[in-house]
Amino acid sequence: MPVFVKICGITNDEDALLATALGADAIGFVFAPSPRQVDADTVRDALRRVPREIHTIGVFRDERPERVVEIAGRLGLHGVQLHGHEPDNEVAWIRDRVRFVIRAFAAGDPRLDRVNRDLADVVLVDAPTPGSGRVFDWRLVEGIPSAVRVLLAGGLTPANVGDAIRTARPWGVDVASGVEARPGRKDPRLLREFIEAAREAGDEIDAVEPSPAVSGADGDEVAGSTRPWDWEIDE
């Protein structure tokens, strides 16, 4: 199964186009306070030039649920990523109103051992200090139920993403600072090397292990799916 690759912290249309041209599956726009924070107008301009098949994701942290849904709907984002301490009832409310939700947890969070697809479509596991660029022990994801799609983040770079994939066997990987020339601007060489290294590691695993089946929107198993939701519904 190809490893899903999300490039986060996109702040301009040039980087959005570069990431998609190099083979990224998804790009993320940060609406929460951050060196990579963007406004709706910037995202709208970028989305006009991004191919439809690319997953576009808005990243929020402890934002009002109504605001999350309003921004996602107004811009036509495919999904949202909740990177704060959002309670389950707010997450459920948002999930009823957007296509899919990525929910972030810090590595070692005890909730990861009992997380399930009712809480999020995709679970992102980050370093204890999100955005710090620090690597954590990738073995900490081993206790997550196998039916959960895990998006691995936290200090990933072109130099270590292959080892991270071979160790943690995630559904996908997420990177921001690890492919930057400076905060908010992507480095073309690092982007290319990261995506190539992730694909290579995924291919190596596929060569020796069968692709796991994951549940689609209707609950049926979809072998090797890298789609966060049943894409056919929207076509």
Model-based region annotation:
Residues M1-E235:
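Conserved N-terminal beta1-alpha1 strand-loop-helix module at the mouth
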